[in-house]
Amino acid sequence: MYDIIIVGAGPAGLTAALYALRANKKVLIFEAKAVGGQILLATKVENYPGIEAISGEEYSKNLYNQVKNLGAEFKYETVIRIDENRVVYTNNPENDITYEAKAVIIATGVENRKLNIEGEKDYLGKGVSYCATCDGPFFKNKEVAIVGGGNTALEDAVYLSAIAKKVYLIHRRDTFRGEDMYLKELKKTPNVEFILNSNVTKIEGKDKLESLEITNTNEEVSTLKVDGLFVAVGQSPRNEIFNNVVDIDERGYIISEDGVHTKTKHIYVAGDAREKDLRQLTTAVSDGSIAATVAIREM
């Protein structure tokens, strides 16, 4: 039996592991994809206190090495179920293998929804970004586009309008789902231009992003020259498989009244997987440290 099993090896999960390992606990971490989570997408991290600049990849590598050197055990399997007794089931081909712990921390994070268009993967980190607060400062006095129609897209447009020379807000409809206060502000902002009833259908360039192919609802195609594209079409948490041990809100996030406990004793949540107002690296590591500390205290 493990002391703590952590599901997810992003900043929240790895920080939880760090605190647990320093308390001499036996820790197992499950990761279905790549260690680091969403922060891997960040070209540079410049808003983490005490670190002037670091790539998301380098930050993730450093954090991984830190917990690995302290004795963390990693398994690259997909968790498919957790029961009330903290028995963890995975997609391991040998179905009779399960894992048990005194405490479980769910830190599965979220996935950014993709446009799934030509060039999106090719120019990731070369003009394509899913995080305006992470990468916006690299586009100072440049021209950028944002695609999306919810609050994230509108907030990103407000934020980027103070940094970029020009901001194009592209939306597939003529009305937005986001709040009116953001729209009113954007309509008064001189360097913001709306491109409505349109989709980004292709991303083009050479060594970096140079232009977007835009197709409107009349199937008219045009080219928009920009330096960057911020994709803000939503995020998807991955919590449905845990709904027997946690409560989930209408958007799929884990409900926690105090930000750490779930409805099941000794099963905790940390990071972007839970309902919260701000999803940043700093809030993820904060969640992870709190979850581990509380889990240890309540063992």
Which residues does each PLM region occupy?
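Phosphate-coordination loops involved in phosphoryl transfer and adenosine-cofactor binding
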Residues: 1-3, 76-77, 140-142, 197, ...
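A Rossmann-like FAD-binding core segment of flavoenzymes
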Residues: 67-89, 95-101, 162-257, 299
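Beta1-alpha1 glycine-rich phosphate/pyrophosphate-binding loop at the start
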Residues: 2-70, 152-179, 249, 294
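Conserved phosphate-binding and hydrolysis motifs of nucleotide-dependent enzymes
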Residues: 8-13, 109, 148-150, 271
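Glycine/small-residue-rich loop that forms an oxyanion/phosphate-binding "nest" at active or ligand-binding sites
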Residues: 74-138, 149
